[in-house]
């Protein structure tokens, strides 16, 4: 027996009884707008259901629990935190950067603080409240008389204070480092030059970076063609598994800047 979108919606409604669900057609698929206490979230439930596979098991049940928790905690964050009441010192202390795909929030109707990063990714600024975070819009910067770039500087400073944790795997002469501090900002460490340069000193010009979803960053020391094939397969796997997928495109780092690097696997 396989999962259905209705089954997952029921799980969410158990936690958010007054939730309203609106369906919107985009191309040949359906996107759902969830509305809870005047806050909204857009989700692609059908893509998530496909990731679960055709059989129910403990692993897929865990993925559903994580998915529901992610949605519920985000709505609770929208309700709890009023950015209109923030003071400048509090904002500076708790602001962090996160990275999203350029397809995320394309129209930016909420006027979120959004900065360019790469052809595949954009940077957003969020207010962290320990159990989650809330995206910041430009009302905050206008209200507190601070520029997007200045606030981004403080956000990067807070990111750099986080501990660096990672696992290392070696396969056929290639080394793979998986960042896993599990603090909600592992993917965002692609913005931390200190982290990138720490690994660059180890790796040098064979430095590849992967950002398949928000909760991981893959740094690879690639020595041969097989290493590239492994990296691409890992990227696709992680992208499919992530709650907030970002990109399957890999980046190369030269000690100064990131450049998109397309890996073609035969």
Descriptions of predicted regions:
Residues 42-49, 194, 200-201, 227-239:
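Helical (often loop-to-helix) elements that flank the catalytic cores of nucleotide-handling enzymes
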Residues 2-17:
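Short, non-transmembrane alpha-helical segments in secretory-pathway proteins
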Residues 14-20, 161-163, 201-206, 239-246:
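Structural alpha-beta junctions
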Residues 11, 15, 25, 29-184:
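Charged, alpha-helical interface segments at or near domain boundaries
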Residues 26, 35-39, 129-130, 210-215, ...:
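Short, flexible beta-strand-to-coil junctions
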Residues 222-266:
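C-terminal structured domains
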Residues 176-230:
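Intrinsically disordered, low-complexity segments enriched in Gly and acidic/Ser/Thr residues
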Residues 29-32, 216-217, 258:
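Hydrophobic residues embedded in beta-strands of well-ordered beta-sheets
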